[in-house]
A protein has these predicted regions:
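Hydrophobic residue at the +6 position relative to the catalytic HRD Asp in the kinase catalytic loop
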Residues: 220-224
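Short amphipathic alpha-helical recognition elements used for nucleic-acid or partner binding
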Residues: 248-251
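Catalytic-loop of the protein kinase fold
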Residues: 209-219
């Protein structure tokens, strides 16, 4: 399910003749999974909230409203009259994820042969740590509450307030709005642009405002509210960044925008993106990062499926020397979730075909990356 949700974002990179038949099926993975029977739901609620769990609600819908990843969501009304979303973890989901991770770790040596530039051990350790957090809804509640406090009065971004939580149940304020998948499918260009810019602003600002980076960007986790704000859901996967975005990340972005291939290469070496025993052409490294920096080179930029397909074809063409770079670069563990967010949001923006001043938005929050005039 987690893989399917990630894949549904990157359908934008597929050629249209292949993407079209899969688009609707993949998008369903962002919000759909087989629902739990009501009796199982009641059993989980009784175990987590107590046998008198119904006393907490004035109403509770037994039929799940949405299902995704490791849990499902029920609509209810809390005892104080607040409309709430009740997220219930599938029984056995935590054990299944850990089992899957153990299977992946068995193949880590093979991955190392395919990707000789990558140090697999710290990546596996980071993945394990994040999975342990993601299956504990108390971690999620903590992250969501921090973001709610940071964005409580924000004109563009809405975070649902946490009502109560246990390790397996999370009760939050209900957010009404148009699912981002619907905006992608039939939204106006104004809606598409607004959604893209608001999501960009959220990810640019969250580390400095909340000390976190929401690290599960797929359309099922966003809603466009009637008042124009973007609603953000599911804080199970978050990167704790108490000092904001890492300075090395911003430095590398600046070197790329300056077209300073040597400084970029030196930074990659220093920060572990290129292992000591690996030697690559600095100019090819710079060229490989075009999808990251091109949207920040012009006053406005329009993301599109065609653009993403072109970029994917360029770095995936074995005849192109740039394609080999992806197999030679390392991904330090502390950048795994930042990379996930960068790739995921790029896919979303291309699905939306969003257009806007992404460069100016980035410079508001990261003025130090401004290229040398």
């Amino acid at each position: 399910m987690k893989f399917g949700q990630a894949l549904s974002v990157f359908e934008a990179a597929l050629p249209e003749e292949f993407a079209k038949p899969y688009r609707e099926t993949l998008t369903k993975l962002q919000e759909s999974a087989p629902p739990l029977p009501a009796k199982v739901v009641h059993k989980v609620l009784a175990k987590e909230l107590g046998d008198d769990w119904r006393d907490n609600f004035t109403s509770f819908e037994d039929q799940a409203t949405a299902s995704a990843s490791i849990g499902q969501v029920h609509r209810a009304v809390w005892k104080d009259g607040t409309d709430v979303a009740v997220k219930i973890q599938y029984p056995g989901a935590a054990e299944a994820l850990v089992s899957d991770l153990n299977q992946i770790q068995r193949f880590s040596k093979i991955f190392g042969l395919v990707l000789p530039g990558v140090d697999m051990k710290p990546l596996m350790e980071e993945l394990r740590a994040r999975i342990i957090e993601e299956v504990d809804y108390l971690y999620e509640a903590e992250a969501q509450s921090a973001c709610y406090t940071a964005y409580e009065n924000d004109p563009d971004i809405a975070i649902p307030r946490v009502v109560t939580a246990t390790t397996k149940v999370l009760v939050s304020q209900w957010l009404d709005g148009k699912p981002l998948a619907d905006v992608i499918k039939s939204g106006t260009q104004k809606e598409r642009n607004a959604a893209g810019m608001h999501i960009a602003r959220f990810h640019f600002t969250c580390p400095d405002r909340a000390g976190l980076l929401h690290a599960d960007p797929h359309p099922g986790n966003f809603r466009l509210l009637e008042d124009g704000r973007i609603g953000v859901l599911d804080f199970g996967a978050c990167n704790r960044l108490p000092d904001g975005f890492p300075e090395p990340f911003k430095n590398l972005l600046k070197h790329a925008l300056d077209d300073n291939a040597q400084a970029l290469y030196d930074g990659f070496k220093k920060d572990g993106f290129i292992l000591p025993e690996v030697d690559v052409d600095p100019n090819l490294v710079l060229e490989y990062l075009v999808p990251l920096v091109e949207p920040l080179r012009t006053p406005t930029f329009k993301y599109s499926r065609d653009w993403l397909r072109d970029q994917s074809a360029r770095v995936g063409d074995p005849r192109n020397p740039t394609a080999k770079i992806g197999f030679q670069l390392n991904l330090p563990a502390e950048y795994v979730l930042i990379h996930r967010v960068t790739m995921g949001t790029t896919g979303i923006f291309c699905q939306l075909e969003a257009e806007g001043p992404f460069r100016d938005e980035a410079l508001v929050w990261f003025p130090e990356i401004a290229p040398v005039a």
